[in-house]
Amino acid sequence: MSARCGTIFTTFAATILLLSTVGGATPHYIWNASNSVPIGLYRVQPATQLTVTELVAVQPPDLLAAFLDLNGYLPVGVPMLKRVLALPGQTVCRNGLTIAVDGIDMGQAHERDGRGRPLPVWQGCRVIAGGDIFVMNWQCADSLDSRYFGPLPASAVIGRAVAVWTDEE
């Protein structure tokens, strides 16, 4: 997808989000324009309990949102669609570029993004604390997720994302 098309789709996604959140309500639909999960329309439903592998809509915390916006990855206010990879009590490790959960290799991080810019790095093992989650789209090697920015507060989860229509259908 060209950068121009990506910008148009991201703007469309932000518009849908803005229109769906008027009055403080949880957004009901999100248009995903990234390749991290299939491109398409997703319905956001309440998630009372999260499970590993579940696809969720996440509103990045302020510092992460500013980083994503400043670097042109995602405008402020637009949620990300990510899979839950680890929940409280699970151990997540980054050893070099390898991400492992409870001793099982789940994927690789990259040193640089598609434009050649260095990506955030953390190393070592972390037990996911109560109130946190680790999100990673392991099926997409280029996904910008917890393999770079670490665990997120579970409160950042807007809800469960269910595909309504995607380009894979």
Would you name each region that the model predicts?
Residues M1-E169:
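Extended hydrophobic leader/signal-anchor segments used for secretion and membrane insertion
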